Amino acid sequence: MIVLGIESTCDETAAALVEDGRHLLSNVISTSVKEQALYGGVVPEIASRRHCEFISATVKKALLDTGKTMDDVDAVAVTFAPGLIGAVLVGVNFAKGLAYSANKPLVPVHHLRGHIAALYLTHPELKPPFLCLVASGGHSHIVEVQDYTHYHILGHTVDDAAGEAFDKVARTLGLPYPGGPSVAAAAKTGDPKAYRLPVPHVEGKYNVSFSGLKTAVLNEVNKAQMKGEAVNVPDLAASFQERIAGILAEKLLLAAADTGAKQVCLAGGVAANGRLRQLVNDGAQKLGAKVYLPELKFCGDNGAMIAAQGYYQYIAGHTAGLELNGLPTLPIDYE
């Protein structure tokens, strides 16, 4: 079964073809990230306009790259939540029109479920149940994946998401957007023990908080400026990365130990962070759990993950009609 996946929740316009939820046929991404970088972050209006400009050609290329047409496609999957609502609606409305005109089933896909499904593309042998940390620009969740369409949230951020914290700290340090790769690059030459950044304490055993950590970085920059000194950017970047990666890994591994999970996974944009991957891999080995990490090209937003999850949503009977609407927020464990 071939599913066309369409993704447009933020600044990536993406489309892909995936067969049987595991086999990648094509994967095309058009991005406005360079334009967004001029403003230090995503401007929703610009993102929406670029989606309108890019989406038709992006979907067409995903088909052309495989030599297939809509006659070969069995279903059209699209991210319908959560995300920047203007951006989401571009993808939803395009997918509705395409599915209707081609007489194909329309499959709504939750963005975070898509990030988790990216693991199936990298690891075709992976099957639920497993434990997954989904960390991206807008979300940080520790999730029990019970089967392909049922999820249980164990922990979440109580304020800023991990990816958002990376972006804001990068801006504070004068590093370019997107913040995750910029902070990681700067941290390579820094000392992770140079700055003693706080470990936030929050209610909920597996919950995380990053607003205080973000503020602590800002305070270090302000202190240096008041003394007429230049902050050591590599050291502060390394210290921040060490702290945030340590918090995320610790919470995930704690949940794995408590639940007895034998499969531990990372997903989402922050899953590309090398230090986080190392900490989770090392910690899971001590627990006797197998670690599954997504291929780097599947960490960020892409259409392949939506097509992969769309396959499982479809065989579970989750389809929609032309009444499908986009939503800015929706929990991953919605029914």
Label for each model-derived stretch:
Residues 78-104, 121, 274-283:
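Short Gly/Thr/Asp-enriched flexible loops that form oxyanion-binding sites at enzyme active sites
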Residues 2, 8-9, 16, 26, ...:
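A short helix-loop
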Residues 70-80, 259-270, 292-295:
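Short glycine-rich phosphate-binding loop at a beta-alpha junction
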Residues 108-109, 281-306:
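Conserved phosphate-binding/catalytic loops in two-lobed NTP-binding clefts
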Residues 2-82, 111, 115:
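N-terminal beta-alpha supersecondary unit
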Residues 69, 185-264, 273-287, 314-317, ...:
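A contiguous, well-structured pocket-lining segment that forms one wall/lid of small-molecule binding clefts
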Residues 109-131, 309:
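Conserved phosphate-binding catalytic cores of ATP/NTP-utilizing and phosphoryl-transfer enzymes
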Residues 115, 294-333:
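Glycine-rich phosphate-binding/hydrolytic loop that grips phosphoryl groups
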